[in-house]
A protein has these predicted regions:
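Thiamine diphosphate
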Residues: 1-147
Length: 147
């Protein structure tokens, strides 16, 4: 039997390392995508923190703020619905006073039916999109450091 507890206002840090360069916050089906992105980036030697934000209202502000501060003030939220009123809003609000940038991956068009892998890809919330977002952040950081 699974004895794991899920407290209201809580979250679970699934992957954490001192070398984490960004934090990915996901909920529901996008947690699987975040885990896959973690595995792909790890093969390239890139560490990301992955948080399952199973409670969105209220959101786990202390965990998110700490993660953001420890991972270069960068958080990527990934949600399988529209951006407004969802995970991205909750994460942005939680870290707003701490100079943490939140990149929000969410469904931005009318949902359709189809295979889940195809839909996750189409809506920009797949593991591939998470990996690309992390890479873009690292690239822009390196350009700033060189200038």
């Amino acid at each position: 039997a699974n004895e794991e507890s899920f407290d209201i206002g809580g979250s679970k840090v699934l992957y954490e390392n001192v070398d984490d360069v960004a934090t990915v916050v996901a909920a529901g089906i996008t947690v699987f995508e975040a885990r896959e992105a973690y595995q792909r980036l790890l093969k390239e030697g890139v560490h990301i923190r992955v948080i399952d934000a199973y409670s969105i209202q209220p959101i786990d502000t202390p965990t998110l703020v700490l993660a953001g501060l420890q991972t270069g003030r960068k958080i990527i939220s990934v949600e399988d619905h529209y951006p407004s009123g969802g995970l991205g809003d909750a994460v942005s609000e939680a870290v707003a006073d701490h100079g943490i940038t939140v990149s929000r991956l969410a469904v931005r068009e009318v949902p359709r039916s189809g295979k889940s892998e195809e839909l996750l890809e189409r809506y920009g919330i797949s593991a591939s999109h998470i990996v690309e977002t992390v890479r873009r952040q690292l690239d822009s950081e390196q350009r700033i450091a060189k200038s």
